[in-house]
Every structure is written in C-alpha cells, then in structure tokens.
Amino acid sequence: MNKFFTRFKASEHGGEYLMRLISAWLCSLVLILLFRPVKEVFNKEYAGEAPYLLLILFFTVFYGLLTVLRFIPKLRDMKTDCAALLISTAQFTVAYAVVMFREKGTNIDFFLGVVLFITLAVWYTVGKQRIRLPKFTKKCWIAVLAISAVFMLVFTALAMSLRYYKLCTPCFDFGIFTQMFENMKDGLGPVTTVERNYELSHFAVHFSPAYYLMLPFYTLFPHPVTLQILQGIFVTSGIIPVFLIARKYGFSLIHSSLFSAIYALYPAFTGGCSYDIHENCMLPAFLLWLIWAAEREKTIPMLVFALLTLTVKEDAAVYVAVIGLYLILSDRSEKTRALGAVIFGAACVYFFAVCAYLNNSGLGIMEWRYKDYMYRGGALITSLIVTAFTNPGYILSNLFTGEKLTFTVQTLGVLGGIPLVSRKIARYILLIPFVLVNLMPTYPYQDR
C-alpha cells in the first residue's frame, strides 16, 4: 500500500491537483446554470437556493474524468490538467459574461475581473507549466481558417439579416442605405430623401465611392438582406490578409490560422456590424491588404489598396496617411519608404480635396465632432495641430473620460494590450487613428 501511494504521489504534482479541482469546480458551476433561472445568478439569494447535490455530483464526475485521463497511456505525457484549466476558465468566463450581459448589460468592472481571471490561468498554464499546443496535422490550419470564416460570416451576415426580418434595426441608417442602393440601381445615383428629410446625395454627407463596389451584387439581388450579407463578406474577408501577414512574419500555418481566428472573434469587427451596413465595413479588409502589400513590398497592390481605402470615406485618408508615415519613419528599404511617401502625400491631397468638395458642394466635414478643440477664430485642422503642441494636457483630459476609457479597455484589453508594447517606436504612429478618430471626437458613436 505504501508503495502504491509513493508511486501515486510521485506521478503527480501538487499544482496538478489544484488545477484539477478548479477545473472540475468551474465546469460544475457552468453546468448547473442549466438547472437554475438565469436571472437569479447575480443575486445574493442564489447561494441559498443553489442545487448543492447537483453541484457535488457534477464536481465528482468532472474530477473523476480528469483523473482518469491522467492514467490513459496515450495522454500520460500530455498536460491534461493544464489544458482542462484553460478550457474550463474560458467556458466559465464566457458563460457568466453572457449571463451578466443579459441581466445587467455591459459591465466594464466585470470585464476587467474576467480579464484578470483569464490572465492568471494563461500565465500559470502557459508561462509556469509550459503547456504547448498539441501537434496538428498539416491540413488542420485549413479547418481553423474555414471555421473562423464561417463563424464570422454567420454572425455578421446571417444574424444581422435575421434581425432585419424581426424589425430590430437599432437606427434609421439602414433605411438610408437601402433607399440609396435602390436609387443607384435605377441610375439615379446615391440619392436619399430620408437622410436629411429632403432629396440629397449621400456623398454630400460622406464621400464614399466604395459603395459602387457593392452595386453589381445589389443589382443582381435587389433586397436589403443583400446589403447585410455584403457587409459580412467584406468584414470576414479580412481573415485572409491577417493569415498572410502572420506568414510573412514567419509564423507556422497553424499559428497563422489562429491569428485569423482571433480576428474573427475580435468584438470590434463583429460588433461593429450591429448598426447595420455602413461604409466602414470595408475598412478592415482594405487596410489589412494595404499592410500586407507594404510588408511584402508589392508596389501595385499597395497603391491599389491605398486607393480603395481612400474611397471608403473622407476620414479614411487618415489611416492611409498614417500607414505612409509609418513606412517613411520605420526601418524599411528605400523603395518602401518612397512608396510610403507617395501614399502619404496622396492621402493628404485626397483628404483636403474631399474636404473642399464637402464644404463647397456638400454639408461640410462635420467639424462639430471636434468642437472641444476648436478655439475662437481657429479652423479645424489648425486648431487640432495648435492644441496638440501647446496644450497636450487638455487633450489627454478629454481622452480618458469614463466611456472612452471603457472603450479603450474593451478594444485594447482583449488584445492583451499588445498594441501598446513595442520596441520599435515607429509602430506607435499606428495608434494615431485610434486616438484621432475614436477617442478625440465628441460624437458618441466613435467610441461605441
């Protein structure tokens, strides 16, 4: 008997017992949600009415299964307890986040707690226990890419289409674009009557020629759902350049496909579709293709995708100009720097030309979104530049307000803050659009 206990103790580490206990406990907590009303979870009375016997039963079953896995010959050398901790932590946080959202809506405090919880699990299993991804077959990356694309397309296209049929659109913008595409199909141009309550070209509000890329498909299938599907296709197509960029940096096929999966799960892209079709749905794919072309030093694709990005919206020139500036200041070949200078200059010229068109023939460039930075007698661009150089503290005080801080955590926090950590200072230039377009404006939809 003593020999048995000696061998048993030698085969397992104390940390593995703890991981197994936590994994079984978390799995049990999620499973008993099926036997309790969801509305009672975040309530002090839940503990008094919890199904204790079921909790104990599920815990015993899960702990037993995890223990059995340790004695299966093929799994003996695998860190099954580490994997179980990661999986159970993920499913627990997702399940309780869904319950929290249904019961109380978005809660940044709960989100931060979830991030800390997941970080500890990842640090212990990946950092301390050195768990590694299992060996995949050579073609497994194709399945990961396909599943990621299907998931993203279903969420951004199918879910939004079903919401349209339920008449659950959140604002009247979808009516604007449906009418606009119908008029474009009939040869009347991007004309609407509901955007400002009189006949008006949408390009007098936002200059977005890229909409004509969607027109052939709408002409073939003239229905509002077509627009929802096209939105999903454009957003989902960004999976491909993400995969190619990862491959350019030397990641394996499976790791590159996992980057694409992260893209598919990133809420800033999928959640952005919840306001129905807007021109911004084309930005992620065009920008990622532009970055891929820059990384591969492909001249024609770089110029093509820079042009496509510019046609999305007047302020899309900011993204192109910043990428050009980044290429100029980063450690690149002379050819790439020259191309960076070209697209930077072209983006600036295009931006000022479109602004002049909107100010003279349209409704203006909506400079009121930056009214907090415009001093008396100052123009928009001048005011922003002068304020940035003479009073940066004022800008910082406006950037880190409650809702904007929440938005920053939601967008950068889910990426582990990686965009904020780099040894190459030129990369921080790429944060300019995030600050200028999302955080600085007073328009609330820029940080939602």
Label the predicted regions.
Residues 62-71, 225-250, 289:
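Transmembrane-helix motifs of polytopic, lipid-linked glycan transferases
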Residues 319-348:
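Perimembrane helix-loop-helix junctions
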Residues 63-72, 394-398, 405-435:
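Hydrophobic, aromatic-rich transmembrane alpha-helices
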Residues 1-26, 60-156, 339-343:
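Start-transfer (signal-anchor) and selected internal transmembrane alpha helices
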Residues 105-110, 230-236, 261-294, 308-319:
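Multi-pass, polyprenyl lipid-linked donor-dependent membrane glycosyltransferases
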